[in-house]
Amino acid sequence: MGQAEFNARTDASAEISAFAVRAEPDSEPVSEKQGTAETDAETGAGGTEVPAERNGEDDVERTPKKSLSFKLAFIGLAASMFVFQVDATALGIALPTIAADLKGESLESFWANLSYTLCGLVMQPVWASISTAFGRKPPLYVSMALFFIGSIVFAVAQNMNTIIVGRVLQGFGGGGIDVLAEVILADMTTLEERSKYLGLMAIPMAIGNIMGPSVGALFATYASWRWIGWVNLPLLGIGTPLVFFFLKLRPVPLDASLAKNLNRLDWIGMVLVVVGITIFVLPLSWAGSLFPWGAWQTLVPLFLGVAVLVIFAFYEARPDAPIVPHRLFHSKTGNMTLVGGFLHGAVLVSLLQYLPLIYQAVQLETAILSAVSLLPTVIISVVVAAISMMLVPWFGGYVWILRLAWVILTLGTGLLALFDVGSSSSMRLGLPILWGAGVALLRLNLLPMQASVKNVDDTGLAIGQFLTIRMFGGLVGLTISATIFNSVFSTSISATAVHLTGPLAPLKDVANAVAFIDKLRSIDVPVETRDQVLRVYLKCFQTIFYTMTGLSGLGLVTSLFVDEIDLKSQGLGNQRFEE
């Protein structure tokens, strides 16, 4: 959909994730409790044995009460995630203003938007692998530094090429912040207490994710788009010192030789996964906008990307420390969780993109007012996140809450199709609330089902794998939604009696449909004509909602195949928090 569709290709990694993983010598899925009971010593990443009391009764005594250092470190991680979530969703709405100011072309705008998402996507499994080999903190510090530098480069840019460079650096850093904060949270908490800290972290993440478009619109309209970059610096300045001074994790034993340490990494696997994902994602991003779906520019890289990823999958059976170990797929619960994560990403990211647009296109609200209309949904999401912290102990597990979350999300997504031209204020404000509640409940209870991934050394790899699949699901969901929008709009506008002349002439090209939304409030056409155009837009959004309802229902089906996990284990990750 041209320039406007480029804006739709935004990152929206707005979920909370943590995996529960334990060390076991065999390959059968077991609970954390079993894993702790059956081992008298825990083997660290470097092969060093840790006495049993450090992993058994001692943990039971220490974990219920958290120290001040733990709490401050957690606040630092949550603050860093808030910055990442705001930045991830702020650019899309401001990109037309940036392109106009810097005289950027459509292709440059495309890369400015895609580079952030793509770099964050491909680097998540890489950062996770590095953190497993060298410890969590060094790559986290590097990620924060890259994000900080990228924000400055973006803020001072004088041309679109510099904007792209800044977004690439921010993508590298943001992807690391996202995955490593999740991994560290899993290391720091037991399975029983994890829902509490997931709920606490969900609050700044949900607020940041929804605030992003409003921040972008406010700066682009009333100040300068450069503040989208500058505002990251003081916000990151809150979280970084807290993490640096108070995050005390058990170090990973390293060899004296740098070469031996570097040999721990699966270099070939990293190259294959980065190249494969990049080649595969690019045609998904430009299909229907830069090139048609049937063009060789779309099909050739798509098939090449699949081929490289297949090679990567087979190759990962060879390294001693693969980036994606095959043992991660030995659990039915883990596999169903991955499928659920993909579907969750598709539904969430698509609706985060198109919900504000239905307010602007059908209800004729400005970008800022559309964000205000979604505030009740944000508030409910935060409340549900807080309540969910208590639900897991009450239910005695995650499975039934997970299924309830999918039911609520399916119903809430279906209700969005009730939007209509001239809907009442109560309808406009209330329809997305159930969807928001389902999203909040699901994001907190989906990922802990990865308890069947049992090797404690695989914590980072498993989370990196999940976040990559979830983000990839979001990109696929956006592609599906954009294709639906194009197809339905083209068919529906042709079926109306509206003459696409004068101020409506741009709508002859479906690529202009989203960009034209801003003009709907002021076009000089008869009321009946505008009403017909608005109903064409409405039909596009309703079809997207119907499709996402189906995907949500499929997610509910996946939850029927997951097994309950034991909440009584007090086991922590190898790189656990230490006083």
UniProtKB/Swiss-Prot annotation:
Decide whether keyword Transport is in the record.
yes
Q: Which residues are glycosylated according to the annotation?
A: N335
UniProt GO molecular function: transmembrane transporter activity
Localization, UniProt: Membrane
Phenotype of the disrupted gene, per the record: Does not affect the production of sphingofungins.
State the InterPro entries in the record.
Answer: MFS, MFS_dom, MFS_trans_sf
Protein's recorded name:
MFS-type transporter sphD
Q: What is the lineage of its organism?
A: Eukaryota, Fungi, Dikarya, Ascomycota, Pezizomycotina
Q: Which gene encodes it?
A: sphD
